[in-house]
């Protein structure tokens, strides 16, 4: 990661004349004459169909090719070849520059200043600039796109000059560069459905070449070098059922777990599975305001009784990685170690909180002359088979140990209402941790667990205001220690996502959160 202190420079407003998105090969030749020995000829659709050195991907639910607007996961994935982000996340959830060159953070952790590459061109030959970034972020902040939630804490974005953009947040954000993994569209891009894709990626959009096939041609003037693969075919299926059938017949060279459910689908043939640990956390939520659950030793005992290994291997089919803290196990700033090893048994922790196993069965205690029993309701979304199985497994473990637990499967809307109003004992939850690993949204003021700790709040704020790598590692380690001693809730596992690729494709880089097809310009075919 590049980090250096930057001086923000005020610049006059640049008035940009919008150009047509149509592909003008003569214009393109002129713009790139100095960068290529032999300019690329734009082929007609009939010629495109004969390209041999190609890869085939699938697509369905086409609504628009605008990568910020589409609601189709397959379209988003196809457009990864055409559009690029400022940064991408590697397998360690570490931001790596793509269109960005480097960046710096303000002392208060609220402003990121990003320097951009100066050798990037759009597929129509225009130069890439900070004004494109400003436009893309403006569209996202307007609420029009599927990325609006990602930048909900942004208060301002401005192009300081042609190669520098500054973005300010309403609170300190740790590892802020990790937020800028969305595709950048050109300044003035049509936000309507029928826009023609013009990106900066290794492959340019050539159009529809048959009834259900689109073509992406390699962009010979790509700043990363000429891609070895000539093109990408995008075969359109009428619906998901046909898409899955085509996957089953091996019609596609690439697909992902976002569109293919690996719980029910087994890839045929010699398909390579490229996994990464996502930021989606599955956990047992605990209502800390409940008298029976207010003691941290009670929560520690419950945590010890959960068989995370079984849940991960047998219920989630090893497509998850178990965890003890709400930080991605692959995260480059956290090594996952604990400062102290818990040597007490679950029974030992329960006894510290005055729980005893009565002859009648189950744990009880007497406080202020009143007898309490440790009997819990575990609510779960009945629409998720996985979560239902996890709930049943946890309830079985608790009941066997003497913690009386009843599972209550609820309709999704009813489940959400109970969680948001904090009307529950324990629950099976799911939360997508931001790529920044900023857990303030999960554990901040008013959190759904009724958990409050001044020490934890201070740690979270310090993490947000720190940019030094070694200092961040220390703070994340402190966070891990504090979390595992308090156990406001029980993290169970982070799910994994997967890119499935044909063995004929070489030089594939491990996918990362938010971008499956990383560095496709380096791919080769056997």
Task: Name what the model sees in each region.
Residues 157-158, 206-215, 233-290, 301, ...:
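Extracellular/periplasmic solute-recognition and catalytic clefts
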Residues 104, 108, 148-189, 304:
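Surface-exposed binding/hinge segments that line
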Residues 305-335, 386-395, 419-526:
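Detector for C-terminal structural segments
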Residues 101-144, 292-294:
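Aromatic- and charge-enriched surface segment that lines or borders ligand/interaction sites
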Residues 294-395, 478:
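Append "and occasionally in soluble cytosolic enzymes with long acidic Gly/Pro-rich linkers
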Residues 57-105, 138, 198:
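N-terminal lobe/hinge region of extracytoplasmic solute-binding protein
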Residues 177-231, 236, 241-242:
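Gly/Pro-rich hinge or "lid" segments in bacterial periplasmic/extracellular proteins
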Residues 59-79, 99-100, 126, 176-183, ...:
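A structural "hinge/loop" feature
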